[in-house]
Amino acid sequence: MPSQVLKRVFDEAAQLSGIPVIFRASDSLQTQANLKMARNGELAHIIQYHTKYAMQKEYLGTFQAGFILRAFGANQSNRFEVGSTPSGRDEGQKLVSEHFQRLGVNLPDNKLRHFASAIYDGLGVQIRSVPVGLRIDSWILTNYPELKEQQ
């Protein structure tokens, strides 16, 4: 049963987006929590938190729901997704390859592709998540001071 804070935030996210929020524990996540925002007719936004962080689940759920609120709170004409393209991925691999060549490092193609992909995807996640995440944390601190100890 979600806390009053989670219920309020999830209800607001569902009302704003027109899509319900499912919140559940998982012991297989690689992170503390994640969000799979509903797209292309999916029936729910899914927020998961790792069972190791159950003591912080109110904060983790509120933080992830903040991404839904920010995405759907923007005018539809101003919404966009940060994502990768095949040409961007190819350019990233080329840049990483050139850098290794300058260093005199010779990686097999499969390792180079794997490394370049990790760098490319990691940078994309950071560019997309960190600025918004900082704003969400500030919003939580201002609007839900009872979660401060979990932040």
PLM features per residue range, with description:
Residues 1-41, 54:
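Auxiliary, metal-adjacent structural segments of Zn-dependent hydrolase domains
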Residues 6-17, 65, 69, 140, ...:
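Hydrophobic, Leu/Ile/Phe/Ala-enriched alpha-helical segments that form helix-helix packing faces
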Residues 45-61:
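Short pre-active-site segment immediately N-terminal to the catalytic Zn-binding motif
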Residues 70-119:
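Post-HEXXH active-site segment of zinc metalloproteases
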Residues 123-136:
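Solvent-exposed aromatic/hydrophobic patches embedded in short alpha-helical segments
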Residues 135-151:
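Pan-zinc metallopeptidase signature
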